[in-house]
Amino acid sequence: MRQYLNLCQRIIDQGHWVENERTGKRCLTVINADLTYDVANNQFPLITTRKSYWKAAIAEFLGYIRGYDNAADFRKLGTKTWDANANENQAWLNNPVRKGTDDMGRVYGVQGRRWRKPNGETVDQLRKIVNNLSKGIDDRGEILTFFNPGEIDLGCLRPCMHTHTFSLLGDTLYLTSYQRSCDVPLGLNFNQIQVFTFLALMAQITGKKAGQAYHKIINAHIYEDQFELMRDVQLKREPFPLPRLEINPDIKTLEDLETWVTMDDFKVIGYQCHEAIKYPFSV
């Protein structure tokens, strides 16, 4: 995927070294990156210049759609992505609101499905969007946001990819996703799969055609212990053609996504890739 490699090269060539207090590492950083995914023509943005794993990314976002707040529920879907943040983040372990093992608090999907109002009632942002789009309504506010400044301290992690805005032009559905921070060698592969799949699913359950998905990243970075692998290995490889994503056509409603859908309902067709690269992960 050439636009991904172009961003990596831009960071290598133009990035500024920034100290990251949370991880104790330096990051080579650029501000503002824009990526576009062709969902209409099913050009699935799975990185081909190293072996990439897509199921955990879709499983995680399915957990957000369901409003999960417990790492055990994510494991049942097929992803362990929340194990460390729920159980090994010392600040969260010391937080008195934490309910115990695997509790994530009010993060991501909790905000998307149960945003709290001052009177104690909750707002289901996703349901409102699905209802409107199914009726052909775009009120220019079809926005799903996971970023709630008033409840940051009630969860184990601030959202990185935090807001998703849907737009209708005729019967074609578009998505613009916003991300405050991105570990490009590791996280971006995960996030671009989620952006693509979210639009594909929402188009399918609302009866619309999928258009383009736009992904805006504010702070795009490569950690210092990832730098040489990116510069000397991954950027030396030629990408293969992008694969396709097949989604079970029996998925027709939000209730389907909430109840019976599993990773068996997704298939990637025609994926070719280079050998795996083991990038260090920063917690």
Swiss-Prot record:
Keywords: Cytoplasm, Methyltransferase, Nucleotide biosynthesis, Transferase
Catalytic activity: dUMP + (6R)-5,10-methylene-5,6,7,8-tetrahydrofolate = 7,8-dihydrofolate + dTMP
PROSITE patterns per the UniProt record, alphabetical: THYMIDYLATE_SYNTHASE
EC top class, as a word: transferase
Record-level Gene Ontology MF annotations: thymidylate synthase activity
Its EC number(s): 2.1.1.45
Positions annotated as active site in the UniProt record: C160 (nucleophile)
InterPro entries according to UniProt: Thymidate_synth/dCMP_Mease, Thymidate_synth/dCMP_Mease_dom, Thymidate_synth/dCMP_Mease_sf, Thymidylate_synthase, Thymidylate_synthase_AS
Residues annotated to bind (6R)-5,10-methylene-5,6,7,8-tetrahydrofolate: D183, S282
Gene3D superfamilies per UniProt: Thymidylate synthase/dCMP hydroxymethylase domain
Any one annotated GO CC term: cytosol
Subcellular location: Cytoplasm
Record: residues binding dUMP: R22, R180, S181, C182, D183, N191, H221, I222, Y223
Pathway in which this enzyme or protein is active: Pyrimidine metabolism; dTTP biosynthesis
Annotated GO biological process: dTMP biosynthetic process; dTTP biosynthetic process; methylation
HAMAP family named in the record: Thymidy_synth_bact (MF_00008)
Family note: Belongs to the thymidylate synthase family. Bacterial-type ThyA subfamily.
Function comment: Catalyzes the reductive methylation of 2'-deoxyuridine-5'-monophosphate (dUMP) to 2'-deoxythymidine-5'-monophosphate (dTMP) while utilizing 5,10-methylenetetrahydrofolate (mTHF) as the methyl donor and reductant in the reaction, yielding dihydrofolate (DHF) as a by-product. This enzymatic reaction provides an intracellular de novo source of dTMP, an essential precursor for DNA biosynthesis.
Subunit structure: Homodimer.
PANTHER family the UniProt entry points to: THYMIDYLATE SYNTHASE (PTHR11548:SF9), THYMIDYLATE SYNTHASE 1 (PTHR11548)
UniProt-recorded name of the protein: Thymidylate synthase
Species of the source: Histophilus somni (strain 2336)
